[in-house]
Amino acid sequence: MTDPNSKAPRLQGRQEDKQTQTPPPRPPPPPQPPLTPRPDSSPHQNSHNKPKPEEEGTDGGPPASQGDRKRSKGDQGPDTGPGLGPGRGPSPKPTPLGPPPGPGPRRSPRLGPLQADRDPEEGPQPPAEGEVEGHPGGDQGHPPPPPPAPHNGHSGHEPKVQQPEGPEGREGHEEGAVGGEGGDEEGHPPPPPPPTNGHEGGLLSSVASLLVKWEGHFDQLVQSIQDDLEDYWKKLATPQ
């Protein structure tokens, strides 16, 4: 039979061996590839409109841009047309924009009304006084003739009133003739004013000649009436 106490020293010796043993060294981690810079959306132009220097990649060549990657997959970029290959160069760089337009030169407040008067878009000006459409300023020197002045009393061109025959009719006719003479003397129109121009002078001269003619006819009529009255009184004075 084996002694149980003999196993105890063996187990104890194994535990001591495990504690004294060092763990094996760990293998070194695998080398990681170096990080490549992230390509910008506009690799040829930065925020200050300056060309960006090209950076070398891990293998010494220029970094692959996003546009080249798209072209390698078969997509057409903005710089490639239907007849251009993926290896063609990009489009030329855009020129920097100029300064934004300002509010413009200031205008003096004194020149405002003058420029408004000279604006040709206001439309045609209304014609001046005395101008007629189609004849501007033609009637300014020739105003229309004034209407003839009204004549007081008997002007001489009134229709003759026939008096009834007989002694009563002759007396009434005589009274009317006497009244007509007085009215003619009171209502005699003044002489016409001197003509100012050719047109108005011709009109006034014709009116004056007509008035003179009518006045002569009226005087003849009054004279004939007076002669008739004298004969009538003579007949009344003689006994029949």
Curated annotation (Swiss-Prot):
It is found in: Host cytoplasm; Host nucleus. It comes from the Viruses. Its main location: host cell. Residues 1-204 are annotated as: Disordered. Belongs to the papillomaviridae E4 protein family. The major E4 form is first synthesized as an E1^E4 fusion protein from spliced E1^E4 transcripts, such that the first few amino acids of the E4 protein are derived from the N terminus of E1. This is Protein E4. The gene is E4.
